[in-house]
Amino acid sequence: DTLVRRKQICALYASSLKQKSWAILPLLSSADTESSYHLFALRIKGIQEEQRDRIMQKIFDQDVSVNVHFIPVPMMSFYKGLGYRISDYPVTLSLYENEISLPLFYDLTDDQVNTVIRALVNAVESEL
């Protein structure tokens, strides 16, 4: 089942990253809610966009693909044209600057998840 596998992958990411002081893990479940396990949107404490982009490049250089999924509305061209400025939304900007979405798909093997984790940790810790 796809959802079961996605939960397993998220659990692997979470268990491997929870002890990293720089990792801000996504909330996957609480007493009232549970994630759809569609994305694993990791945030890296204290970094800005330039650092995030360097980290992502270092991960790419290890043959792992990551992404940024949440582009703030004020950064979209239509809204820029309406006069919205990301500088008016500092919390949103901060969340955007330090977010990296890790691979999360049904066919991802445990070995591949471990490869992602190693690439991520190597990249982040070489940048901080």
For the regions a protein language model found, what residue spans apply to each?
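PLP-dependent aminotransferase class I/II
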Residues: 1-128
